[in-house]
Amino acid sequence: MYFHVTSRCDLTCQGCYSYKEGRNSCEDPSLECIKKALDEISSRGISQLVISGGEPFLRDDLPDIVAYAKEVCGIPSLAILSNGLHIDQSSLHRLSGHSPCISISFDGYSAESQAHIRGTQNFSKLVDSIKQIKSAGIQGHIIATIHALNIEDVLQYVTLSKRLGVTINFSLISFTSSDPHTAGLIPSPSQLYSLGGALFHLGSDSMAGPHGQTRLNISAKRYCGAAKNTLSIDSDGTVYPCHMLHEEKYAMGNVFIDSLANALDSDVARLFQQLDASRFETCSTCKYCEICGGGCRARSLCSSPTLAAPDPYCPLMIRFFELLEDETSRAFCAVE
C-alpha cells in the first residue's frame, strides 16, 4: 500500500510517478484525514505501508503519522520514500522509536555522476542523509532509477550501498516514448535483456530490501496484482490500483470520505482483478507467463492504450527467468 501524504516537492524529476501540475499549491491532507485512512488500511489487514509524496519530510507531522500507523494501527512494515534533501535530526529522533525504513532516491553513484533524472547532482547531501539515518538507529535504503543512460551503473550502485551499509533496490523509469525530452532515457530491448542478466547475477543478498524483489521471490500469478495486492492512496484520499496509475479513469474511491472496502468493490477494482496474462497480447504464448504475470500494467499503458498490451520491459523479465530456469535445472540435476 502506497500512501501519498503530500503532493508537495521541491524537485521535478523525469519519470516521477506522482508529478502533477500545481502540486506545490495543493493543501496537504489534515492529520485527521490521514488517521482515518490509516484506520481503513489497518482494518483490511494490510501489513506493508509505503509513505510517499511529494516529499514526506516537508510535513512537520510526519513522525506523528508514522507513530499512528505503527503504534495505533499496528502496521508492522513501514517505509518512507524521500528525495533525501530534507532529512533533519529532529524528525529522525522522533521517528527512531517506530522502526521505519527510510528510502533515499539516488541519481548517480558518485558526486561526478550526471544527474539525468533530477537535473542537479546532490550526491554528497544524499550520502550525508543516509549517514544521519543510520546514526539515528533507523534502517536506511537506496533506490536507484535505471534508464538508458545509466544502465551500465548497476554494479557501482551496489558497491555504493555496501560502502554505506544499507540495502538497495532498482526502479525502472517508465513514461511514454512520445515525449522528445525523455525518450532518450528509455532503454532499448537489448539493454533491457542485458539488465535482466545483470540483476539476476547480483544475487538475492545484494538485492534484498523493503521494495525490491529477490531471485527467490517467485510465485504463480495471473497479473501484476494492481487493485488487489497493491493499492495507492493519493494526497486527496483517492484510491488507485497502484502508485503508477494515478489517473482519473482508474479512481476506485476515496478513503477520506468513504471506506476502503467500497473502493475494493468498485468497477475499477473488478476490472483489474479480472485481468489474466494468459489472455494478454504475446503473453499467452510465453512459457514464463504464469510466473511473470504479464509484467506491469502501468508500463504497458506507457506504450499502448490498452491494459492487455505487452509490458515494454518484457526483455528484462525474459532474460531473468531464462537464467532462473537454467539455475533451477542445474540445482535439481545436482541433487539427483
Task: Cite the ranges covered by each PLM segment.
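Conserved alpha-helical substructure of the radical SAM core
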Residues: 1-98
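Flexible mid-to-C-terminal extensions adjoining Fe-S/redox cofactors in radical SAM and related proteins
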Residues: 245-336
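Residue-level signal for the nucleotide or nucleotide-sugar donor/cofactor binding architecture
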Residues: 29, 60, 121, 149-152, ...
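Short secondary-structure capping/turn micro-motifs that flank functional sites
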Residues: 22, 57-58, 86-87, 149-150, ...
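Residues that scaffold the ATP/ADP-binding catalytic core of kinase and kinase-like folds
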Residues: 12, 16, 90, 112-113, ...
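Short glycine-enriched, charge-decorated loop/helix-capping segments at active-site entrances
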Residues: 20-28, 115-122, 184-185, 301-302
